[in-house]
């Protein structure tokens, strides 16, 4: 069996490689996908992928596995970055990691390697189960690290080629294995944030593409201007950190795109703005539309928290969702991901908040 392993330079993908080697497979090749954007890097003054590559090389040397670097900068810009920028301009909250997986890691990469490999292995925390020749996406054993949210838009064809060795492990176990075999990157910290940014600050990326535009920060209850911001695209509804005003905590509760105004409120008043009913479209089902929507739960952001909910099908591409509890951070552009027990069924894009 021929196996391709995607290495990022981090501990997770390195242990995924180790687990495959431990199963006795020998026909293995590793790949590092280069998606850094040269213009941004020269603007910000970093070369963050060099450290990744150093670790990739060190890990491959340890296991005597060949590796190759594949450049997907153009594909990433066209298929993920443009989407992200447009969502921000429209005042929405983008989810680029969902499309990074669907369109690049398991899209452009699959097209590039074509039929060369029987299996593609990554360090994602998720599980794939096969039943009656269908592939089902399941949450990882480690619910804190579970990445099914970001994998929710994969197709049957993509899933048929994938193997996630870390789906049955806790992160603590992964760290223990890394130390026990003395991995070169055993002490490397986990990466945070969007897949293509790495050490680049998200706001620097936004500033590069959309610039800055001064606007007022207004207290919702009083209408009083209490600060100045650099552009509505730097803020998301529900945001608490980064507002940089005294007498906090403050929360972003509304954005006026035309007037470039950010409305904020203190915690007690802000929670009154919590919502529970909204519409989603651009729906993707991993195994086709379910026969019923009973006992569904959804995530509206990456993390452990799921909501019980009621779903009402309006059309095949429009669903009304009613949460059992209100949430104070629902924003257009986010993705609502559907679950039944531990199975991830797919997801859809939030486009209108009702109440």
UniProtKB/Swiss-Prot annotation:
Q: Which GO terms describe its biological process?
A: tRNA modification
Task: Spell out the residue ranges making up region: Interaction with tRNA.
Answer: 145-147
Give the originating organism: Borrelia garinii subsp. bavariensis (strain ATCC BAA-2496 / DSM 23469 / PBi)
Could you identify this protein by its name?
A: tRNA-specific 2-thiouridylase MnmA
Name its cellular compartments: Cytoplasm
List where the protein spans the membrane. none
Q: Which residues form the active site?
A: 100 (nucleophile), 195 (cysteine persulfide intermediate)
Q: Give the record's family classification.
A: Belongs to the MnmA/TRMU family.
Question: A GO molecular function for this record?
Answer: ATP binding
Q: Which InterPro entries match?
A: MnmA-like (IPR004506), MnmA-like_C (IPR046885), MnmA-like_central (IPR046884), MnmA-like_central_sf (IPR023382), Rossmann-like_a/b/a_fold (IPR014729), tRNA_2-thiouridylase_MnmA (IPR051305)
Q: Does the keyword Cytoplasm apply?
A: yes
Q: What does this protein do?
A: Catalyzes the 2-thiolation of uridine at the wobble position (U34) of tRNA, leading to the formation of s(2)U34.
What S-S linkages are listed for this chain? 100-195
**Record's keyword terms, sorted:** ATP-binding, Cytoplasm, Disulfide bond, Nucleotide-binding, RNA-binding, Transferase, tRNA processing, tRNA-binding
Q: What class of enzyme is it?
A: transferase
- Please list the reactions this protein catalyses: S-sulfanyl-L-cysteinyl-[protein] + uridine(34) in tRNA + AH2 + ATP = 2-thiouridine(34) in tRNA + L-cysteinyl-[protein] + A + AMP + diphosphate + H(+)
Q: What is its EC number?
A: 2.8.1.13
Q: Which Pfam families match?
A: tRNA_Me_trans, tRNA_Me_trans_C, tRNA_Me_trans_M
Marked site (Interaction with tRNA) residue numbers = 124, 334
């Amino acid at each position: 069996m021929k196996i391709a392993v995607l290495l990022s330079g981090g501990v997770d993908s390195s242990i995924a490689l180790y687990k495959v080697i431990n199963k006795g497979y020998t026909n293995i090749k590793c790949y590092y996908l280069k998606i850094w954007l040269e213009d941004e890097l020269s603007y910000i003054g970093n070369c963050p992928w060099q450290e990744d590559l150093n670790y990739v090389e060190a890990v491959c040397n340890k296991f005597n596995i060949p590796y190759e670097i594949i450049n997907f900068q153009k594909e990433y810009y066209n298929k993920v970055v443009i989407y992200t920028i447009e969502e921000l301009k429209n005042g929405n909250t983008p989810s680029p990691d969902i499309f990074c997986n669907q369109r690049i890691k398991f899209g452009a990469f699959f097209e590039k390697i074509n039929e060369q490999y029987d299996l593609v292995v990554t360090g994602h925390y998720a599980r794939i189960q096969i039943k009656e020749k269908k592939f089902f996406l399941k949450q990882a054993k480690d619910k804190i690290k579970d990445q099914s949210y970001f994998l929710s838009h994969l197709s049957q064809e993509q899933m048929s080629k994938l193997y996630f060795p870390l789906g049955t492990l806790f992160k603590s176990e992964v760290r223990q294995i890394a130390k026990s075999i003395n991995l070169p990157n055993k002490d490397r910290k986990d990466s945070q944030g969007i897949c293509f940014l790495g050490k680049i600050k998200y706001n620097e990326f936004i500033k590069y593409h959309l610039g800055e535009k001064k606007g007022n920060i207004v207290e919702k209850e009083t209408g009083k201007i209490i600060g100045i911001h650099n552009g509505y695209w730097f803020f998301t509804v529900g945001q608490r950190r980064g507002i940089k005003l005294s007498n906090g905590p403050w929360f972003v509760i509304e954005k006026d795109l035309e007037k470039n105004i950010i409305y904020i409120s203190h915690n007690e008043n802000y929670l009154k703005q919590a919502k529970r009913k909204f519409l989603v479209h651009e729906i993707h089902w991993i195994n086709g539309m379910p026969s019923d929507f009973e006992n569904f739960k959804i995530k509206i952001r990456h993390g452990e928290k799921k909501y019980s909910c009621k779903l009402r099908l309006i059309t095949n591409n429009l669903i009304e969702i009613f949460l059992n509890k209100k949430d104070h951070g629902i924003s257009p552009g986010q993705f609502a991901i559907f679950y039944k027990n531990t199975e991830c069924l797919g997801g859809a894009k939030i486009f209108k908040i009702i109440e």
